[in-house]
Amino acid sequence: MNNRDYFPDLIGQHAVKKKLSFYLEAFHKTEMCPFLNLIGAKGLGKTEFAKAFAKNLINKDGDKRSFLELNCSTIKNNEQFFEQIFMPLVADNEITILFDECHALPLDLTMAFLTIFNTEKNSRKNFEWNEATFEFNFKKQTFIFATTESDKMFPPLKDRLTTIDFEPYSSEELGEIIKLCTPDVTFADGVIQEIAQTVRNNARSAVKRAKEINLYCGAKEKNTFDELDFIDLSDHVGILPFGISYTEKQILSTLKEGSCTLTGLSAKLGLSKTAVQRDHELYLLNKNLMEIDGKRKITSQGLELCKFFA
């Protein structure tokens, strides 16, 4: 195996890079690639890595393989997939298909995929449906799946795929992403680290922060960015410590007054219990700003943060 860097423009995810690089090397020798399943939280770069992986797949004639990205929530049933997607775009073509948010695949197509991807040594698979035969050629067609909710995937389908797990980014990696996305900006010492502390652990959040910095520098007609600039930007766009949202700030302020049940917290915030649990509590728990022990409670770190808001 050579040491070629197939992902020079992507930061972090070293285990993912090693695994995908191995499969690319194998593909270049065998023309075969396993059915990949990219799993991780929102914003960790699953789609970007899938696109970068696909760019490195070369057809027999030396051209880059075509790439098709599908959001599985838009696929309604077998009929739509085979008649509107597979036959005109996939059949007999050299192409890579990304099934994004694959936990949302319709049930009948999931059942079809159980048959289609139930193969080990063969490079072809014929699938019969609705009195027609559809040929899958796995030397021509590469299939990649991605999801943020692997627990909702049909287990037998998940077993047929090769899992690639993504992990949260470190503050240093988030800082590197911000610098990569702000090539015309020179940062004062220590500012990147301070900015990275306000990014919510994922690459997408870092890219958004970089866009805000680019807009700020463009509006100010400057190409340097220091601590005072970051304070000014934070004031204008509402950047809070740890990158928490104003709703999360409200949760901490509520819990500062005393522990609370989920129902009580939901009522005080005017949000559904599901919204509180899925959209706001998770990040506060991740940052150890609150805890759940029967009731919702603020931690000592959360109390320290509330002093900053006072």
Regions found by a protein language model. Name each.
Residues 2-39:
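Pre-Walker A (pre-P-loop) alpha-helix and adjacent loop at the N terminus of AAA/AAA+ ATPase modules
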Residues 17-18, 64-93:
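Short glycine-rich substrate-engagement loop in P-loop NTPases that contacts/grips substrate
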Residues 25, 107-138:
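Conserved catalytic/switch belt of AAA+ P-loop NTPases
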Residues 25-29, 33-69, 86-88:
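Walker A/P-loop
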Residues 148, 162-174:
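Conserved AAA+ ATPase "SRH/arginine-finger" region at the nucleotide-binding site
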Residues 193-197, 204-219, 252, 282:
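C-terminal helical "lid" of AAA+/P-loop NTPase domains
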Residues 199-214, 226, 244-246, 259:
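The conserved phosphate-sensing helix
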Residues 258-310:
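Terminal-proximal interaction/regulatory segments of ATP-powered molecular machines
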